[in-house]
C-alpha cells in the first residue's frame, strides 16, 4: 500500500494509471476509520483496478464552534484498516496543500443544502462540496463511494456531480451498524459508557417508526410524534432535527410512503449524532 501526501504526486499517479487503462475508485474519508469505512473500501476494490482512500480532516466543513481540533485522528490505525480492506493508495494531504495561500473558490449546491444539517450547520455543505470536487479533480476516479449515513451529503454530492458534468459514478452504500444498532461513526469515540447506551435512542426511534409504517401508518405527524417520544425518554438527548423528507428530493412530506426518509440529528451529551432510514427499505 502506498501513501501519497501531496496533491501533485496524487495527480501524477492518477494520470499515469489512466494512461495505462486502469480504473480508479475513491473512498473519501476524514480518517479514524471503522467498519463502515471498510465496507466502502471493500466495495470500491470490486469496482476498479486501483482503490484510493483519502484521509483529510477538512477544515472548511467545520463551523467555528464545532469539533475540528478535537476530531479523532490516528493515522497508524487508519493504515491498518485501509490495508486490511485492500486499499492501494492512501491520499493524506495537508490542509496547506489543499487550500494554499490565496485560495478563494468554493462550490455551492443551492436547494438541497438548505434543510436538515444545512440549516443547523451553516457553511458545512459548501466545505463538503468544495473538498469533494477537489478530491475528484485530483484523484480522477471512475467511481466514488459514500455511506448513506450522511444521506443529505450523498444527495448533495450526486447533484453536484450531475450539475457540473463530472465524469464519475457516485455510489451510495448502506449504513453499517454496531451489533446493538448504533450507526458506526468516528464521533462515537466521544461517547462515554452511559452516553453510548443513550445513543441507541436514534436507531430505536427509527425502528419504531418503521414498524408503525409497515403496520400501515402513513401519517407523518403520527410517525414524528412517536420518534420524538422515543428520543424524549432518554435523559440529556437534545434533538436538533427529526424530519420526514422525500428520499429523492429532500422536500417535506405529510404522507409517508416507501421512499420517505426519516432523518435524525441528536446531541447526546456534547456529541452530535446523525442517523436515518428510508421507510420502505430493509435495514
Swiss-Prot record:
One of its GO terms (cellular component) is cytosol. GO terms for biological process: pantothenate biosynthetic process. Its main location: cytoplasm. It is found in: Cytoplasm. It holds the Pfam family Pantoate_ligase. The active site is at 37 (proton donor). The keyword Transport does not apply. It comes from the Bacteria. It is an enzyme of class 6 (ligase). ATP binds at residues 30-37, 147-150, 176, 184-187. (R)-pantoate binds at residues 61, 153. Signal peptide: none annotated. Pathway: Cofactor biosynthesis; (R)-pantothenate biosynthesis; (R)-pantothenate from (R)-pantoate and beta-alanine: step 1/1. Beta-alanine binds at residue 61. InterPro entries: Pantoate_ligase, Pantoate_ligase_C, Rossmann-like_a/b/a_fold. One of its GO terms (molecular function) is ATP binding. It catalyses: (R)-pantoate + beta-alanine + ATP = (R)-pantothenate + AMP + diphosphate + H(+). CDD domains: PanC. Its EC number is 6.3.2.1. PANTHER family: CYTIDYLATE KINASE/PANTOATE-BETA-ALANINE LIGASE (PTHR21299), PANTOATE--BETA-ALANINE LIGASE (PTHR21299:SF1). Belongs to the pantothenate synthetase family. NCBIfam families: panC. The reaction proceeds by a bi uni uni bi ping pong mechanism. Catalyzes the condensation of pantoate with beta-alanine in an ATP-dependent reaction via a pantoyl-adenylate intermediate. Homodimer. This is Pantothenate synthetase. It comes from Geobacter metallireducens (strain ATCC 53774 / DSM 7210 / GS-15). The lineage of its organism: Bacteria, Pseudomonadati, Thermodesulfobacteriota, Desulfuromonadia, Geobacterales.
Amino acid at each position: 500500500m502506498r501513501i501519497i501526501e501531496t496533491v501533485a504526486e496524487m495527480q501524477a499517479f492518477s494520470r499515469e494509471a489512466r494512461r495505462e487503462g486502469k480504473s480508479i475508485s475513491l473512498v473519501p474519508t476524514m480518517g479514524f476509520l471503522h467498519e463502515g469505512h471498510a465496507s466502502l473500501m471493500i466495495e470500491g476494490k470490486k469496482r476498479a483496478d486501483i482503490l484510493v482512500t483519502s484521509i483529510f480532516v477538512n477544515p472548511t466543513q467545520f463551523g467555528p464552534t464545532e469539533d475540528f481540533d478535537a476530531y479523532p485522528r490516528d493515522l497508524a490505525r487508519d493504515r491498518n484498516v485501509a490495508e486490511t480492506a485492500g486499499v492501494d493508495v492512501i491520499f493524506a494531504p495537508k490542509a496547506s496543500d489543499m487550500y494554499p495561500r490565496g485560495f478563494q473558490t468554493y462550490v455551492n449546491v443551492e436547494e438541497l443544502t438548505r434543510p436538515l444539517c444545512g440549516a443547523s450547520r451553516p457553511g458545512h455543505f459548501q466545505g463538503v462540496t468544495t473538498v469533494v470536487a477537489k478530491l475528484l479533480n485530483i484523484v480522477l476516479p471512475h467511481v466514488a463511494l459514500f455511506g448513506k449515513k450522511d444521506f443529505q451529503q450523498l444527495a448533495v454530492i450526486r447533484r453536484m456531480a450531475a450539475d457540473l458534468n463530472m465524469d464519475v459514478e457516485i455510489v451510495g452504500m448502506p449504513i453499517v451498524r454496531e451489533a446493538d444498532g448504533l450507526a458506526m461513526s468516528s464521533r462515537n469515540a466521544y461517547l462515554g459508557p452511559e452516553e453510548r447506551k443513550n445513543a441507541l435512542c436514534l436507531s430505536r426511534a427509527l425502528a419504531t417508526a418503521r414498524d408503525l409504517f409497515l403496520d400501515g401508518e402513513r401519517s407523518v405527524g403520527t410517525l414524528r410524534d412517536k420518534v420524538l417520544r422515543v428520543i424524549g425518554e432518554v435523559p440529556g438527548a437534545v434533538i436538533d432535527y427529526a424530519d420526514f423528507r422525500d428520499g429523492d428530493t429532500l422536500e417535506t412530506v405529510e404522507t409517508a410512503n416507501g421512499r420517505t426518509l426519516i432523518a435524525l440529528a441528536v446531541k447526546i451529551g456534547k456529541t452530535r449524532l446523525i442517523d436515518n432510514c428510508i421507510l420502505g427499505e430493509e435495514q
